[in-house]
């Protein structure tokens, strides 16, 4: 029964500062590093052995993936990085304090931007200091593929080809898969995996820790879903 382990990156410096992050490439906080290490230890304790790992091209997810693999004694496992697993792009909200954004735009409007399935936040200008246009890590992409703002619907549309081309085939081959990604890119894939409605996914939250595990049958029907927890003494 193949397993898929989702690990949202450990707490980032901007999570700690309560800032909208999106595609901004911020680092893990000290606590976030500890969370990634603990994720690896939980994976080792659970005896889960991976055949392949996937992550985004943002350092907080890459570092979480590397630490989780290191502390589960699986640092040799191949890791594939893809922009399609990046966090949702928060557009013009990127870098803003969430409380300041609410004061400026109103609590209700910010809540709609954050939690609705298909409402886009304000677009990011191409000359914004956080723009992905011109960023070397996206040099191989057509400029039209680089977003200026995303909602969860668009995030799923972006992540879905990677699921269909890479992750799902690996699981169908019976491989155990690790995905180190982000709250909203994981939520998007969970919507696909569990066939959730647009309304149902709105109530789904993915914590920075611990990792989330799915077990599948041969047709990728979910047989079990749980968060890793320390074994009781």
Swiss-Prot record:
<feature type="binding site">
    <location>
        <begin position="8"/>
        <end position="15"/>
    </location>
    <ligand>
        <name>substrate</name>
    </ligand>
</feature>
<feature type="binding site">
    <location>
        <begin position="183"/>
        <end position="184"/>
    </location>
    <ligand>
        <name>substrate</name>
    </ligand>
</feature>
<dbReference type="InterPro" id="IPR029033">
    <property type="entry name" value="His_PPase_superfam"/>
</dbReference>
<feature type="binding site">
    <location>
        <begin position="21"/>
        <end position="22"/>
    </location>
    <ligand>
        <name>substrate</name>
    </ligand>
</feature>
<dbReference type="GO" id="GO:0009986">
    <property type="term" value="C:cell surface"/>
</dbReference>
<feature type="binding site">
    <location>
        <position position="60"/>
    </location>
    <ligand>
        <name>substrate</name>
    </ligand>
</feature>
<comment type="similarity">
    <text>Belongs to the phosphoglycerate mutase family. BPG-dependent PGAM subfamily.</text>
</comment>
<keyword id="KW-0312">Gluconeogenesis</keyword>
<keyword id="KW-0324">Glycolysis</keyword>
<dbReference type="GO" id="GO:0004619">
    <property type="term" value="F:phosphoglycerate mutase activity"/>
</dbReference>
<keyword id="KW-0413">Isomerase</keyword>
<feature type="site" description="Transition state stabilizer">
    <location>
        <position position="182"/>
    </location>
</feature>
<dbReference type="GO" id="GO:0006094">
    <property type="term" value="P:gluconeogenesis"/>
</dbReference>
<feature type="active site" description="Proton donor/acceptor">
    <location>
        <position position="87"/>
    </location>
</feature>
<comment type="pathway">
    <text>Carbohydrate degradation; glycolysis; pyruvate from D-glyceraldehyde 3-phosphate: step 3/5.</text>
</comment>
<feature type="binding site">
    <location>
        <begin position="87"/>
        <end position="90"/>
    </location>
    <ligand>
        <name>substrate</name>
    </ligand>
</feature>
<dbReference type="InterPro" id="IPR005952">
    <property type="entry name" value="Phosphogly_mut1"/>
</dbReference>
<dbReference type="GO" id="GO:0006096">
    <property type="term" value="P:glycolytic process"/>
</dbReference>
<protein>
    <recommendedName>
        <fullName>2,3-bisphosphoglycerate-dependent phosphoglycerate mutase</fullName>
        <ecNumber>5.4.2.11</ecNumber>
    </recommendedName>
</protein>
<dbReference type="GO" id="GO:2001065">
    <property type="term" value="F:mannan binding"/>
</dbReference>
<feature type="binding site">
    <location>
        <begin position="114"/>
        <end position="115"/>
    </location>
    <ligand>
        <name>substrate</name>
    </ligand>
</feature>
<dbReference type="Pfam" id="PF00300">
    <property type="entry name" value="His_Phos_1"/>
</dbReference>
<comment type="function">
    <text>Catalyzes the interconversion of 2-phosphoglycerate and 3-phosphoglycerate.</text>
</comment>
<feature type="binding site">
    <location>
        <position position="98"/>
    </location>
    <ligand>
        <name>substrate</name>
    </ligand>
</feature>
<dbReference type="InterPro" id="IPR013078">
    <property type="entry name" value="His_Pase_superF_clade-1"/>
</dbReference>
<feature type="active site" description="Tele-phosphohistidine intermediate">
    <location>
        <position position="9"/>
    </location>
</feature>
């Amino acid at each position: 029964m193949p397993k898929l382990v989702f690990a949202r990156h450990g707490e980032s410096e901007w999570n700690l500062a309560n800032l909208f992050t999106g595609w901004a490439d911020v680092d893990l906080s000290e606590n976030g590093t500890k969370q990634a290490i603990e994720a690896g230890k939980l994976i080792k304790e659970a005896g889960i052995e991976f055949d392949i790992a996937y992550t985004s091209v943002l350092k907080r997810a890459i570092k979480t993936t590397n630490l989780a693999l290191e502390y589960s004694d699986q640092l040799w496992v191949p890791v594939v990085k893809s922009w399609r697993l990046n966090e949702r792009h928060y557009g013009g909200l990127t870098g803003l304090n969430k409380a300041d954004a609410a004061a400026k735009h109103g609590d209700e409007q910010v809540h709609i931007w954050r939690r609705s399935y298909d409402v886009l936040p304000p677009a990011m200008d191409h000359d914004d200091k956080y723009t992905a246009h011109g960023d070397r890590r996206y040099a191989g992409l057509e400029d039209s593929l680089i977003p200026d703002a995303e909602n969860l619907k668009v995030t799923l549309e972006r992540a879905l080809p990677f699921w269909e081309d890479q992750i799902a085939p690996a699981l169908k081959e019976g491989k155990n898969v690790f995905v180190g990604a982000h709250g909203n890119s994981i939520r998007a894939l969970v919507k696909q995996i569990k066939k959730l409605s647009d309304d149902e996914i709105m109530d789904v939250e993915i914590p920075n820790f611990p990792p989330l595990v799915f077990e599948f049958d041969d047709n990728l029907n979910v047989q079990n879903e749980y968060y890793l927890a320390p074994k009781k003494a």
